[in-house]
């Protein structure tokens, strides 16, 4: 790698980190009540004796921290799924993984009476895992194996079917499922440090597994035969990457609800400026994903003031045309 490329990637990382700090500051300052920089500093540094503005900032801190964590996790999950399937359209939402996790939680609430975050995570991971395996199996049928188009179609069809099942379960239980219906929109409001701490171990494990698989996934981009020739165990690499992606997505979905398109948009933005090497794409996507989610959440609060629009709805509104652009630009070819 040339010193120019190395220097450029360092500059990109510094720029992304700076953008993330700006997004975090905007998340703390904007909303139904805008606060000043001095109030942000006071709200972050004080433990008591808050002014009204500082109190608002203090209450927004868990939301902003969770936005950072969830954005990183979803972007890394999308990056890993794109690498595992060699599909530029792969994303936890497009492949139906988010919807599978949501359906599992609905079933758990309606029929098994689950209520704790740990139970939510267990059901979300189960639903995400089963859906990921099912979509990949369906997409692998027929001539050519698991092509990008077939995986996207299988994921979209599966997501639509699972969404209808979610609605079928929700409709007769309008009163008891009101809280879940709000959760289903996908958002980071109402996050607490306790909830973040509960999902943090799974996210750390998923991120560690993804980082361990980066070298082999880079080789996998050359094709299975070439990767095998380089000594890569393709089946194990795909399994490791898939498990990491499901852990990252499932844990985040359990607390935030299904937030789509973050895992699709962030990796593509990063590849445009940093190239295809996953050693750089994965960490930069995490930073970009956190920035995008915080911007979506902040925009939802500003546009919907004095109420708010959930971040999942904003990201879907922005991400849908980007999906069309990516499909047209790449002609849906494999990575």
Predicted regions and their residues:
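Alpha-helical transmembrane segments in inner-membrane proteins
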Residues: 1-335
